[in-house]
């Protein structure tokens, strides 16, 4: 069986939620949240994660509008994601991230965690949801 190594990112203005998957590509898990400081420092952190996890693909959530259109925020996300993918020398795939942050907050409330006090956890969980959506769409997994 082919080993899957993808990194999911939830890109925000202040933070980047990061998620990884198990080698089978079945389960995505939140790894960390990077508090953005500068592009260079952010890339140092991401590069280390990529090396440690032997990442082969970058998956970024794209915030489409509720009508399914690429709006201003999605354009900004695409631009930053392409810059990150180039810096990390990784192929890039986008996935619809609509409502992932809301879904992450709901999950936290179910676990009796106050989302307002754990913004980094929201980003990390949203990144895991983004990566899980991508993994669930991959054809190599359904042929087992």
UniProtKB/Swiss-Prot annotation:
GO MF terms, alphabetically ordered: nuclease activity
Pfam families linked to this entry: RuvX
Swiss-Prot/TrEMBL keywords: Cytoplasm, Hydrolase, Nuclease, Ribosome biogenesis
Keyword Cytoplasm in record: yes
Cellular component GO terms, alphabetical: cytosol
Domain of life: Bacteria
Keyword Metal-binding recorded: no
Gene Ontology biological-process entries: rRNA 5'-end processing
Broad class of enzyme this protein falls into: hydrolase
EC number: 3.1.-.-
Subcellular location: Cytoplasm
NCBIfam families: RNAse_H_YqgF (TIGR00250)
Physiological role: Could be a nuclease involved in processing of the 5'-end of pre-16S rRNA.
Stored PANTHER family: POLYNUCLEOTIDYL TRANSFERASE, RIBONUCLEASE H-LIKE SUPERFAMILY PROTEIN (PTHR33317:SF4)
Similarity comment: Belongs to the YqgF nuclease family.
Descriptive protein name: Putative pre-16S rRNA nuclease
Annotated source species: Acaryochloris marina (strain MBIC 11017)
UniProt lineage: Bacteria, Bacillati, Cyanobacteriota, Cyanophyceae, Acaryochloridales
């Amino acid at each position: 069986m082919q080993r899957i190594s993808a990194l999911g990112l939830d890109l925000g203005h202040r933070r980047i939620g990061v998620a990884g998957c198990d080698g089978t590509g079945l389960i995505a898990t939140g790894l960390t949240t990077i508090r953005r400081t500068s592009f260079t420092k952010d890339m140092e952190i991401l590069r280390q994660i990529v090396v440690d996890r032997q990442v082969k693909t970058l998956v970024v959530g794209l915030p489409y509008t509720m009508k399914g259109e690429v709006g201003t925020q999605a354009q900004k996300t695409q631009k930053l994601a392409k810059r990150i993918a180039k810096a990390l020398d990784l192929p890039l795939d986008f996935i619809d991230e609509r409502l992932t942050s809301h879904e992450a907050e709901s999950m936290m409330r179910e676990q009796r965690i106050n989302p307002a006090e754990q913004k980094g956890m929201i980003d990390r969980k949203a990144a895991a949801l983004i990566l899980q959506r991508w993994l669930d769409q991959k054809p190599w997994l359904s042929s087992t």
